[in-house]
Design a protein with these regions (language model features):
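A conserved, positively charged/aromatic
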Residues: 117, 160-167
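Short beta-strand/loop segments at the ligand-binding rim of alpha/beta enzyme cores
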Residues: 139-149
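Active-site metal-binding loops of divalent metal-dependent hydrolases
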Residues: 8-10, 174
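Histidine-anchored nucleotide/phosphate-binding helix
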Residues: 27-36
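Conserved phosphate-donor
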Residues: 168-175, 180-201
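Short beta->alpha connector loops
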Residues: 50, 127-131, 150-155, 174-177
Length: 201
């Protein structure tokens, strides 16, 4: 079996006006997908508050093959959430203050969490996580495979600093950035995946 850990973003989308909830976050989505494959032992490592959003998230994955024993409950913090708005045509959009996510953005891993990650075969993290630098440092001296989601980040010079340590590099993009990642793929050993929305990857 392959031991996979996804961290640290567990959040809810909260739809304005209806307060309808959807569980998500890069780590949660990756873990749910990976749990469909029997060869993976999947764990989530992250943090939630002691609130209704946390309960909703944990209930949403209770029937999945995902170990949640490494999810911290931080009583003095709010579970990450993203207030989502809809246009008249039904398209989602966000405001500057939509995201409430200090629990993820400022998360620092403790000794036990770092030791657990070291023993994993595959580690998934997103670039904006507060613990991203810790994961890169761990990767330099450990043999796990590292997958990183850069989402819509566009500082390619900054990205390239991490390329030597990343085995699977993911980013949401457009055709215009493909030459950049083609060049990266010839220079570094990792796999570079650019998601082009309805045009595939």
């Amino acid at each position: 079996m392959i031991n996979l850990v996804a961290l640290p973003c567990l959040c809810v989308d909260v739809f304005d006006g209806t307060d309808e909830l959807y569980a998500g976050g890069e780590a949660l989505n990756f873990a749910v997908h990976a749990s469909k494959f029997e060869e993976f032992n999947v764990s989530i490592l992250g943090a939630v508050g002691q609130d209704s959003y946390a309960k909703f998230i944990m209930d949403s994955i209770s029937d999945k093959r995902i170990d949640v024993s490494h999810v911290r409950v931080e009583k003095d913090k709010v579970t990450a959430n993203n207030r989502t708005y809809l246009t008249a045509g039904g398209d989602r959009y966000y405001k500057d203050d939509s995201w409430t996510g200090d629990i993820v953005d400022k998360m620092i891993l403790n000794h036990d969490e770092l030791e657990f990650i070291k023993k994993s075969d595959v580690v998934f993290v997103h670039f904006w996580a507060g613990c991203f630098g810790q994961i890169i440092d761990l990767k330099k001296n450990n043999n796990f495979r590292l997958a990183v989601d850069f989402v819509e980040y566009r500082n390619f010079k900054e990205m390239e600093k991490y390329a030597p340590y990343i085995d699977y590099f993911m980013i949401s993009g457009e055709k215009s950035i493909l030459p950049i990642f083609e060049a990266f793929s010839k220079k570094y050993k990792g796999l570079f995946n650019v998601s082009l929305a309805d045009k595939g990857s």
